[in-house]
A protein has these predicted regions:
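A short, Lys/Arg-rich alpha-helix, primarily the initiator
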Residues: 10-35, 82
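Recognition helix of helix-turn-helix/homeodomain-like DNA-binding domains
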Residues: 45-61, 68-70
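Short alpha-helical "recognition helix" segments of helix-turn-helix
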Residues: 36-42, 69
Length: 109
């Protein structure tokens, strides 16, 4: 069974930050294949520090990295970019959502 906490339910839950794409990369792709960060970095032709920082949740998945991951794993770049966008949005909602709702008024029709 997957250890990843990414589910449709989690994405829809406004009080919870969705999983960072690095956790998904580690739990659903690297570990099952027994692949190291260094091996993936070599295969993608990127610095190991980039992949390591993504796996640790310290760096976002960029469009360039999404293209490389998609090519290597047979996924789509949108898969990786959507994971990043959902993570960023839920994190921003948790950190700033109330202040934004309080400070920004909807445009009058």
């Amino acid at each position: 069974m997957s250890k990843s906490s990414t589910t449709t339910k989690n994405i829809a839950t406004p009080n919870r930050v969705t999983v960072h794409p690095g956790e998904m990369l580690n739990e659903e792709f690297l570990k099952p294949l027994g692949m190291s960060v260094n091996a993936l970095a070599m295969a993608l032709r990127v610095p190991a520090t980039r992949i390591g920082a993504i796996v640790k949740g310290e760096r976002a998945v960029t469009a360039d990295t999404a293209l490389r991951l998609a090519r290597f794993y047979g996924t789509s770049p949108e898969f990786w970019m959507n994971l990043q966008a959902m993570h960023d949005l839920t994190k921003a909602r948790m950190e700033s959502g109330e202040a934004i709702a309080r400070d920004v008024r909807p445009r009058a029709a």
